[in-house]
Amino acid sequence: MAVPSVKGKEYESVSEIRGQLLVVEGVSDAGYGELVDIEMPSGEKRRGIVLETGKGLAVVQVFEGTTGISPAGTKVRFTGRILEMGVSEDMLGRIMNALGEPIDGGAPIKAVEKRNVWGEPINPYAREYPDEFIETGISAIDGMNSLVRGQKLPIFSGSGLPHNKLAAQIARQATVRGEEESFAVVFAAVGIQYDELLFFKKAFEETGAISRTAMFVSLANEPAMMKIVTPRAALTLAEYLAFQKDMHVLVIITDMTNYCEALREISASREEVPSRQGYPGYMYTDLATIYERAGRVKGSKGSITQMPILTMPNDDITHPIPDLTGYITEGQIVLSRDLHNKGIYPPINVLMSLSRLMRDGIGKGKTREDHPDVANQLFAAYSRAVELRGLAAIVGEESLSEVDRKYLRFGEAFEQKFLKQDYYERRTIEQTLDLAWEVLSILPEEELTKIRPEYIKKYHPKYRVKAASQK
């Protein structure tokens, strides 16, 4: 990325400070993405990165912000290096800033090697197709929107919804069955409030999940560039753990909306022509450089699975951030404000959610043979129950047929028993599927048209009770 032709060359020609940007005059050979050392007249040092060059000018984004910097007497030295971060397995169990520096009061981290933070998306030709189930312990995800190793599956949330709570639960519970020892979580918190940091720290430490988790944090009051770097630093460590140490790594990024706001802030500082709702026209490409670093690589045992979380402004799923994210990723988990208001946690709207790779990661030999059929039946039955609720609100429940009233009972049981679960409750996939059969048994057997007859005879509670009584 960087052009090292001005390596070590120092300038005192800062002509303008624009937001968090420095404009340096008289620079001819600076490289895009090149690291810059900045020294103020007081001796205080800061770091920056070249965002733009041309016409003898270099535009530098300052990591720590420009507060206190004066054009007069400020020295800018171009290093000829790109932004790198030291990586090590010792980073598991630690809390770090966007640059991989410990902020938990612990000992310094001894790096095994240094890696380019900007990284590269995985070459499509080198990709291995994702087809191994990841158990999150959450029925609405495992049963109906299954996560597959190497997938990128975002969570679309809204302001005030419990996405942080859900993220902490997934980070604590998720595992690849039979591969528990080689499973790690890399958690990137982008632009969060300090109380949110304390929540995540407490959630991981209380349950012991911190031992297999590396946290990268940029707070809301930190400069935009720190928020831009945070998910990339997390993915840099994830790539090392996955493809050098053969680990299965789940990367959770919250909140990508904060990331996009930082991207818009930097774009505005550079006076770029805005696109939809003021976001830069290259936001799609920029998001792809993050999301496409997830996956499996041929010849490697490890993998990177991504669950980015974003809050939809005004709950608008057509907003540019969720809209562009949906084009790049392989489905979405959508949280519902209506379910949240009914006291259901996690408030996952399964009808609006989708996992495009689910079919390849479930079924016989992966989860259980009846899983695909049961998921289809749950979708069909719950969809009809929701439709009948609207009809009952108009004509009254007593005007519905007996079968329709059973669908209403199913819908209520589905939400209260299947969707709803405790924050500390971890369900295996077998428990999830058995629970699905329990709520489906409310419906007449002839209504279970999506499930093969042999599975009904084997797994339906009615036949299980008969089989148990005959033993």
Curated annotation (Swiss-Prot):
Sorted alphabetically, the Gene Ontology cellular component annotations on this record are: plasma membrane
Q: How does it sit in the membrane?
A: Peripheral membrane protein
Q: What are the entry keywords?
A: ATP synthesis, Cell membrane, Hydrogen ion transport, Ion transport, Membrane, Transport
Which residues pair up as cystines? Answer: none
Record's subcellular location: Cell membrane
Q: Which Pfam families match?
A: ATP-synt_ab, ATP-synt_ab_N, ATP-synt_VA_C
Q: Does the keyword rRNA-binding apply?
A: no
Q: Which GO terms describe its biological process?
A: proton motive force-driven plasma membrane ATP synthesis
**What broad class describes the main subcellular location of this protein?**
membrane
The GO molecular function terms of this record are: ATP binding; proton-transporting ATP synthase activity, rotational mechanism; proton-transporting ATPase activity, rotational mechanism
Extract the HAMAP family matched here.
ATP_synth_B_arch
Q: What does this protein do?
A: Component of the A-type ATP synthase that produces ATP from ADP in the presence of a proton gradient across the membrane. The B chain is a regulatory subunit.
Quaternary structure (record): Has multiple subunits with at least A(3), B(3), C, D, E, F, H, I and proteolipid K(x).
Which family is it part of?
Belongs to the ATPase alpha/beta chains family.
This chain's protein is named A-type ATP synthase subunit B
What organism is recorded for this protein?
Ignicoccus hospitalis (strain KIN4/I / DSM 18386 / JCM 14125)
What lineage does UniProt assign to this protein's organism? Answer: Archaea, Thermoproteota, Thermoprotei, Desulfurococcales, Desulfurococcaceae
User: Which gene underlies this protein?
Assistant: atpB
